[in-house]
Amino acid sequence: MTGAEYDKCVSQYSDNLYRFALKSLRSDDEAKDIVQESFLRLWENREAVLSGKEKSYLFTVAYRLIVDRVRMGKRYTGDESVLRTSPAPGRPDYNGISELIDRFLDELPPLQKSLIMLRDYEGYSYREMAEMTRLSETQVKVYIFRARTALRRIIGDINNIL
């Protein structure tokens, strides 16, 4: 990988990688750290990463770093209001809906949450997710099925309350 190819990867994937880390950790600083560490590892291993597999490599590294941080209990517990913005007048409050979805996702086990985010937010295939997480493709499908079932249950419980 040349410097120009690396720069192209940074411009192409940094935003998606950042969103993935931010949704998982809910900390701007930690998300930036994850992105920086992921790209650092890509550069350090540039000779071993196959051409065309850079995105998969970056998300695999980010996923593993996120899992490590969650296991160590370093989830963000500060003021989340810094991540919120007010909707423009006359526009629906999509941020409120986004926060609600984030809360629902937070109720899932970390692995299920990460897989849902990789599949539904980032558009990865089951095969790509299996490679990233070192699970079989069948296991990935089962975890996603369980996560979606749990989300339906959670949303159903909310509807009964409302």
Regions found by a protein language model. Name each.
Residues 1-19, 23, 29-32:
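A short, charge-rich alpha-helical start-of-domain segment used by transcription regulators
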Residues 19, 33-40, 44, 52-64:
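Structural recognition of an alpha-helix C-terminal capping motif at a helix-to-coil junction
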Residues 29, 127, 138:
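Residues within helix-turn-helix
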Residues 60-80:
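Arg/Lys-rich amphipathic alpha helix in sigma70-family domain 2
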Residues 72, 81-106:
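Acidic, proline/glycine-rich intrinsically disordered inter-domain spacer in sigma factors
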Residues 115-119:
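A short pre-motif secondary-structure segment
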Residues 130:
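The alpha-helix within a helix-turn-helix
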Residues 133-157:
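DNA-recognition helix of helix-turn-helix
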